[in-house]
């Protein structure tokens, strides 16, 4: 006698598990669609708006070059522009007079620190370097190769070297407020001088590393620095006017977070926006990237502390 065929029933727990798996698949598909759409939006741009033709003169006397011929090593455009040229008239106006520039509050704070003795040696910055004006031109050539240390150094790295070896003081954290204020002071006394970062000789390998990072796609959005600041500068994206990502204006006071921001702050934010794990401020990767990006602005004037959105 043939045995009856038993019907196979799915248990309630199995049904719930299958339902959850289906939901996860749908959510993953939807997330992938959103990511693809976001990347496409960045690459396509909502609208095109060329940089304006306004000229920047600070305090009626410091002429800032905001447009010039691209250096020979910049391969994909002929003209370079300061980020100031991509800002609204209202934002641009903050830089015309130091009394209106909120970034100058950091400069004033650094002036006090400049003359303050610290550390086991009881020395101040002024004891070795004199008045801040005597540092005019330093910002224009950093990052630069340090022969004694055998490495490319940013201004922040050099400031900490002075604090530790000459003053016997504790090093500042790379993105500490005091550090960014001090770099803003050093930038302010170099305003109007042309960026002239050296990329040959022993600095070349670091520069090449920075270039590789610049063109590498990162994160879930698979975007590189070049995708925004080279391929799509001038495009409007989420009401923001994409610039060429020049660093001549750093440190930059951002209206968005109401503070001075270092170059590495901005690098970190950009990579984070691609939904990637980011390098740390002061890391060899960001030092290399800063050298490369700074060299792309050779010929533009030192402008920091600048004001941006």
Feature-to-residue mapping (PLM):
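Bacterial N-terminal signal peptides that target proteins for export
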Residues: 17-35
């Amino acid at each position: 006698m043939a045995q009856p065929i038993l019907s196979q029933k799915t248990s309630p727990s199995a049904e719930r598990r299958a339902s959850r798996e289906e939901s996860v698949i749908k959510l993953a598909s939807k997330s992938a669609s959103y990511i693809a759409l976001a990347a496409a939006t960045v690459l396509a741009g909502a609208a095109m708006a060329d940089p304006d033709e306004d000229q920047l003169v600070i305090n009626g006397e410091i002429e800032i070059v905001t447009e010039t011929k691209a250096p020979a090593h910049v391969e994909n455009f002929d003209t370079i522009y300061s980020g100031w040229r991509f800002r609204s008239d209202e934002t641009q106006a903050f830089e015309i007079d130091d009394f209106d520039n909120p970034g100058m509050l950091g400069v004033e704070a650094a002036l006090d620190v400049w003359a303050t003795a610290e550390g086991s040696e009881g020395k101040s910055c002024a004891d070795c370097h004199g008045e801040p004006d005597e540092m005019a031109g330093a910002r224009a050539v950093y990052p630069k190769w340090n022969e004694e240390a055998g490495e490319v150094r940013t201004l922040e790295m050099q400031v900490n070297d002075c604090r530790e070896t000459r003053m016997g003081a504790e090093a500042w954290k790379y993105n500490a407020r005091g550090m960014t204020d001090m770099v803003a002071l050093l930038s302010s006394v170099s305003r109007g001088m042309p960026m002239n970062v050296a990329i040959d000789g022993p600095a070349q390998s670091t520069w090449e590393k920075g270039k590789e990072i610049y063109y590498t796609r990162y994160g879930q959005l698979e975007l590189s620095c070049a995708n925004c600041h080279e391929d799509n500068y001038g495009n409007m994206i989420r009401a923001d006017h994409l610039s060429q990502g020049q660093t001549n204006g750093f440190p930059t006071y951002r209206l968005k977070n109401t503070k001075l921001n270092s170059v590495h702050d901005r690098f970190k934010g950009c990579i984070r926006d691609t939904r990637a794990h980011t390098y740390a401020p002061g890391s060899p990767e960001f030092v290399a990237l800063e050298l490369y990006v700074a060299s792309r602005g050779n010929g533009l004037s030192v402008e920091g502390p600048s004001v941006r959105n």
